[in-house]
């Protein structure tokens, strides 16, 4: 026994990670290239086709003058800007290197060996990685019609449950849980179980019955909401995210995060991006127009499309072979979609809403694929 009373790991010929780490399948991002194709339309990572705000780009360029200086470890200017934008308490805001970092830190802080973390069967892959990294046990619950099922989550809760992750809207399905259901989940969970609401795509949702969950953070000691600057704000390369949490949770995160986990350029650029609401409004309008158009046009070709409230669509095919054939056909034209077999959806591809040019090319490409298939089948 060690001084702490725990059993030491068996000796080995080399340093060994704990068993949870060895059970992790490394995250594989969407493709970004197609060999032999001159022009690429990357529609695999849910990046905004409008790019970042011009004001954000100016702020990023200006930040080069301070590259030799450490950033403000508390990200005070950014937390203040976020609080002002959403009417929040800045003391409850914690910033991170993308919301991925915060999702992982929450597991590291609140989950340990022998304890369980819950997520849904087609939920974001990072949840499982975070749970295993913390030494916890991942518990996967079924969805209903590709949508988070509150009753299934509650049925999976045990005395060992410590954390529940839900993506709302969900990636890669694009479905969402109405606020009434999210509230029911928050109210029904034991008070010692942390509910993490991942609202990475929340800015795109225009449904009246949706909420990212800020209200629940204010009224529950066990609810955290995470957001990112990677999607609608167009700052994916800077790795910038934030969460709104109860004071005790924010305090715990601030104890374990890196002292300078948010870079100076990211802070400055994030502040400028928040201030340019006109750019965000344009991004929302563009998405509303083309999300609807893509769904209708692709549906006319006979492919099933899951209704989405985010900036992407889940396309369904006859089987995995057809999904792979469509993926290869479109890739040959420089149209890069996301295979989602790793999410348990081998018969599907995820399509990011792109520029007008890219969107029209995708539909034209699918039409040509259908024609080629008809010829082959005689």
Curated annotation (Swiss-Prot):
Enzyme Commission number: 2.6.1.9
Broad class of enzyme this protein falls into: transferase
Keywords annotated in UniProt: Amino-acid biosynthesis, Aminotransferase, Histidine biosynthesis, Pyridoxal phosphate, Transferase
Catalysed reactions, semicolon-separated: L-histidinol phosphate + 2-oxoglutarate = 3-(imidazol-4-yl)-2-oxopropyl phosphate + L-glutamate
Keyword flag Nucleus: no
PTM sites of type N6-(pyridoxal phosphate)lysine: 231
Pathway(s) served: Amino-acid biosynthesis; L-histidine biosynthesis; L-histidine from 5-phospho-alpha-D-ribose 1-diphosphate: step 7/9
PANTHER family referenced in this protein's UniProt entry, alphabetically: HISTIDINOL-PHOSPHATE AMINOTRANSFERASE, HISTIDINOL-PHOSPHATE AMINOTRANSFERASE 2
Protein family (similarity comment): Belongs to the class-II pyridoxal-phosphate-dependent aminotransferase family. Histidinol-phosphate aminotransferase subfamily.
Protein name according to UniProt: Histidinol-phosphate aminotransferase
Gene transcribed to yield this protein: hisC
